[in-house]
From Swiss-Prot:
DNA-binding protein that may be implicated in chromatin remodeling and/or transcriptional regulation during spermiogenesis, the process of spermatid maturation into spermatozoa. GO terms for cellular component: male germ cell nucleus; nucleosome; nucleus. It is found in: Nucleus; Chromosome. Expressed exclusively in the testis. Residues 113-177 form the H15 domain. InterPro entries: Histone_H1/H5_H15, WH-like_DNA-bd_sf, WH_DNA-bd_sf. Residues 179-194 have a biased composition (Basic residues). This is Putative histone H1.9. It comes from Homo sapiens (Human). Residues 177-214 are annotated as: Disordered. Pfam families: Linker_histone.
Amino acid sequence: MLHASTIWHLRSTPPRRKQWGHCDPHRILVASEVTTEITSPTPAPRAQVCGGQPWVTVLDPLSGHTGREAERHFATVSISAVELKYCHGWRPAGQRVPSKTATGQRTCAKPCQKPSTSKVILRAVADKGTCKYVSLATLKKAVSTTGYDMARNAYHFKRVLKGLVDKGSAGSFTLGKKQASKSKLKVKRQRQQRWRSGQRPFGQHRSLLGSKQGHKRLIKGVRRVAKCHCN
């Protein structure tokens, strides 16, 4: 029969290939004892709790120590040889995660968006100053300066501008042409109505011929001969 000390010695000396990288019950027992001794005072600023219990990483390997000698060596390990590590994503109370703004790099949560075309147009109209009118070229230049491609967004630009004019937000505008006066537009409208109703346009004289022959034209080179009435 084996003695109890012999069994303890056999358990404390695992094979060489399993000495590192595998679970060792003796080392787990000793590590738990050292953990309780180290963390009994106030934890260091970098100390933390992972799963309710602090965990440590021993920097000094225990090669060459077996059995009771390993236990004594573990008990005399200095605190400077133990590094308390952080769990992933955990920080002690009162300590914030260092942001990139503290190092001088400014980060934006959302990418900076360009203002809409309507806002750019309204801003250009509001900033016209003493000028009474704003040309279409000025509006296009303001939109293109914001970052829009006018060659691709020409149709969208006209639609937005027409919508603003219909709402009355941007006043009236002319697309490079002179608007006719109201009196000229009224005369033109009256002429169109007369032509549709069949009335004779203003300034056209009545034919000298009879009403029956008024719309008939005489053929060139043909003369009418006077009729003689014989009694």
